[in-house]
A protein has these predicted regions:
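A helix-coil-helix interface module used to build multimeric assemblies
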Residues: 1-183
Length: 183
């Protein structure tokens, strides 16, 4: 089946696509892959800054080049990762292999590419990438909608602040300390 408004998995990508289109930059598969790349790159840079003896030879001037991998991330890059994933059957491992290819293109990074993803699990990457998408969407493109929703939720939390609920372990406190932090 070809993807269109009628064959989308949910109405969000189907009939509501016009209203949610701006969210694709933050919550699409492309965006998730990009955020995984960003997390892996920033983690590698952090390892270099510790400093680990094995990474002491990494020139700090290369950090901007590394960051440009995710800053200039393209659909072709995402497709390359999907192609790697079709062989590895592992989404995060495909990101790791993609970054190793990028290190090869940079030259002089052969001794360091085994430190991509060093000491991490796939969940470490996913559990950082997914919240990053929410954070960036709030900070960049969806402020109006987010402020509206947060304002409504804040009102609900105020109205229900004395209501107890089974399994409810957190208190929202006073108005303004509610579910969302809105600007």
């Amino acid at each position: 089946m070809e993807l269109d408004l009628l064959t989308a998995i949910s109405p969000i990508d189907g009939r509501y696509r016009g209203k949610t289109d701006a969210l694709a930059a933050y919550f699409s598969e492309f965006a998730l892959i990009k955020y995984r790349v960003q997390v892996e790159v920033e983690y590698f840079i952090t390892l270099c800054e510790l400093p680990l003896p094995q990474l002491k030879g990494v020139d700090k001037n290369v950090f901007e080049t590394l960051r440009n991998i995710y800053r200039n991330f393209s659909e072709a890059d995402a497709q390359r990762i999907k192609d790697i994933e079709s062989v590895t059957n592992h989404d995060v491992k495909a990101v790791e292999y993609f970054l190793k290819e990028e290190f090869d293109k940079m030259g002089g990074m052969d001794d360091y590419k085994e430190f991509i993803h060093f000491g991490l699990t796939s969940q470490d990457i996913n559990n950082t990438s997914v919240p990053l998408s929410g954070l960036l969407s709030t900070n960049r493109g969806t402020d109006c909608a987010t402020s509206y929703v947060c304002g409504r939720m804040d009102g609900y939390s105020y109205a229900c602040q004395d209501t107890r609920s089974a399994g409810f372990t957190y208190s929202f406190g006073k108005r303004g300390d509610g579910i969302c932090i809105s600007s």
